[in-house]
Every structure is written in C-alpha cells, then in structure tokens.
C-alpha cells in the first residue's frame, strides 16, 4: 500500500532536520521545465497567477531566480501546515520513517510526486496554478499515474490510499490506475448534514499518516480502528473504495 498526501504552501527550512540518507526526486527534468517558465515571470505576474501578496511574489521570484543555490531539505521535514504538523515527524523512530519512505508519496505542483526523504528546495506552486498554457494537473497526470502503477506493482498489498485534497489527488488518472484506489473522508455532523471541515480533516489526515508509520500499516482494512479528534469509522457510510470517518 502507498498513501498519498498533498504538499503544503507553508515551509520550514529554518529548523534543522535529523541526519538521514536523502533521495532525489523522480521527475527533476520536468521540474526544470516548470522552473524555466516560472523564472520568466515578473513579480507582478507571479502575484496575479498565484494570487499572493507582492511580498510573497518577491520572495518566490528570488527563490526561482537562484533556485539551484537554494538550501535543500527532505520533503517530509520541509513542509509544514496542518497535515504535516500532525504527522509529528520529529517523534517518529528511524524504523517508522523508513517505512514511510516506502509507503507514502507527497503530491507536488513543482515536483510531481515525492518520497518523504526526497530533497526539495523552497518554492510555492499550487497544483491549481495555471502557467501560460500549462495545466499542472494535466502536465503531471500521466507521469505520476504511471509511476504509482510501477511502485504498487512491487507491493504485497496493491492499494493507493488517498489522503490528499481533491486539487492534488486529481493528478491520479483513475482510468489508467491499475490498482484499487481507496479514498479517505473525514466528516462531521453539522445540522443533520455530513460535511468536511477543512482544518479538522487536514489534522486527521496527518494523524493517519502518523498511525500508518508507527504501526507499519500496509492495508486500508487495518485503519478502521483509527480515531483522532473524535472521528470514528462509519461502516454505514463506507465501501470498499471509500473509508468514511465521522466526528460525532
């Protein structure tokens, strides 16, 4: 089984990461193609296409301009935000971290797909961002889907557990994915209607990754006992392809 999560806008390159053996992202040639486009934009253009402030546009213009000389860090330690903060990566044992390296993928607008210990440089590029004529979902879809097919073929339990947002999981082409996709939903009962509350769902996704790592879980079936923030598995609302956890 492999799980997928979305990359994060928030980064943490200030805090030192533990020393560990790092790996190289799979699709650097395609990443460099995107960088060439990003480097051609002015700060004002970056601000508009990314819908960010002038200050953030300046920061990212400088990052892209001198990208090769930027500091590198393992992806799992570089990303911050609600999902990554709730993995509590700094508390994982080396054994748990190594398990994640072979059971977790991070979907990225700039890198396509990353293993936890793949090195990245500071950047901002959401999957929904349009770069000239480049639709990032379409740009990455075949490459990422084919890559996932290859790595799942080597797994004993050939499941893809989707813990990513719709924006990022759309990079997986379900018509070309050869193995079972299992979507995970975290919902809450609000006025008699089941709804997804973004911030709580993100925290729960991160916590589920932590549970996968600490318990060496390689099957969706083993996640049905997961509980965090009051969420509990709902047999009634779930199916073979959908795991639904409801907060009472």
UniProtKB/Swiss-Prot annotation:
InterPro entries from the UniProt entry: YaaA (IPR005583)
Q: What biological-process GO terms show up in the record?
A: response to hydroperoxide
Q: What Gene Ontology cellular-component terms does the record carry?
A: cytosol
Q: Which Pfam families match?
A: H2O2_YaaD (PF03883)
Family recorded in the similarity comment? Belongs to the UPF0246 family.
* HAMAP family the record matches: UPF0246 (MF_00652)
What name goes with this protein? UPF0246 protein RPR_00055
The species is Rickettsia peacockii (strain Rustic)
